[in-house]
Amino acid sequence: MKHVLKWISDLRVAIFLLLIIALSSSLGTALPQKESAESYYEAYNSSPWLKVFSGESIIQLQLDHVYSSDWFLSLLLWLGIALVFCSWRRQLPALQFTLRWIDYCNPRQLSKLALAETIISTDASASIKRLEQLLKNQGWQVQAKSGRLAARRGIAGRVGPLMVHTGLVILMLGAVWGVLGGHRLERFLAPGREMELLNSHGKSQLNIALESFQIERDPVGRPEQYRSQLRLRELGNSRENNSGSIDKSLNREISVNHPLRYGGMTVYQADWALAAITVQLGRSPLLQLPLEQFPQLGEQVWGVVLPTQQDGSNPVLLALSSEKGPIEVFASDGSLITTLRPGGVAATINDVKVRVESILPASGLLLKRDPGVPLVYIGFAVALMGGGLSLISTRQIWAIAELEQQRFHVGGLCNREFTNFAQELPQFISEIQQI
């Protein structure tokens, strides 16, 4: 058991696990996540991903949801245990050793330190006192006894590694909590439409309505930014009005890279689509028809099949890729008949006048509730502070006075920046001799 604990707490094991987790995270970044199994079969069975993973192997290895897979969570658990044991067996004893004052009584003990000097002093006791005052003036902690002293500075540097390990463990706990307890929802909303979010008891908790949606395009027509004007209403049983909703609403605009955070939930502007097209056939009233995506025609192409006769014969396809048009009209044989524009003039198609009144875009919203985010931020902050503290060098100095031999012995240790410390110690001795 002791050998197992020693192996688990080995820093090399933790570093190896970090590399494996980083590699696994890159797989999750490169491969689309949480899509339907059919999409993986269709995309990768004939052409394996990285020429290794077919659609079936991706599903079996849980690569379709890397961050919530059993093996990825097991790696995080293993790394957390390794960091806890490493801190317990190595970092904590090192910190306790540093906090404990070491009292060297014999000059021979100082001679074995990394830095050691012996000088002739007619008043070694006075030299001890001068060194004590000099170190205190420069912020050192000093413990003086009869004929000897011990001093230290930079103890916070020993706390740094322990804080880094603690921060990483907190961060991983937050990540796991977010994966297991978080929720994710993707929805397309057309302007004027709304959706209700339910709580764990199945009751309405929040109403989200899309007031307006705007797509900003460059001169070529490519989308650059999407903006949604949202109205949020809390729903509940207290402070209710006649409609059953609380008199508390919030209007906010979201766009790409500018999400809305509300009540522990984050609403992202994730995508856009075309929801419906409003047409007029002859002298008919305006008809709003839902649009479907046609991936066989292009990546972002929507359309609707429109019959031009009362018996449903002679259908045509209205295809478009922008809310501003144009709308291309194709015959059943795939030939292009004509092109229409929203709000433009009507065109005669198979003896029927067809006019496009407008096109209704839809906003793609991504709603995420991640309860582990505060822990992730706290863990990252603790680890960052620990990393900064780790850069502080811990320095220790001991001095012993031999009154009869008129000798003054000084020695020191340093865990980093040894060259600077090797220059600092002789300066202390020189200042003592000049006083």
UniProtKB/Swiss-Prot annotation:
The subunit field of the Swiss-Prot or TrEMBL record says: May interact with CcsA.
Q: Name one GO cellular component term.
A: plastid
Which keywords belong to this entry?
Cytochrome c-type biogenesis, Membrane, Organellar chromatophore, Plastid, Thylakoid, Transmembrane, Transmembrane helix
Q: Which InterPro entries match?
A: Cyt_c_bgen_Ccs1/CcsB/ResB, ResB-like_domain
Does Ribonucleoprotein show up as a keyword for this record?
no
Q: Which residues cross the membrane?
A: 11-31, 69-89, 159-179
Q: What is this protein called?
A: Cytochrome c biogenesis protein CcsB
Q: What does this protein do?
A: Required during biogenesis of c-type cytochromes (cytochrome c6 and cytochrome f) at the step of heme attachment.
Q: Which family does it belong to?
A: Belongs to the Ccs1/CcsB family.
> Which topology term describes how it sits in the membrane?
Multi-pass membrane protein
Q: What gene makes this protein?
A: ccsB
Superkingdom assignment: Eukaryota
Q: Name one GO biological process term.
A: cytochrome complex assembly
Q: Which organism is it from?
A: Paulinella chromatophora
Q: Where in the cell is it found?
A: Plastid, Organellar chromatophore thylakoid membrane
Q: Which Pfam families match?
A: ResB (PF05140)
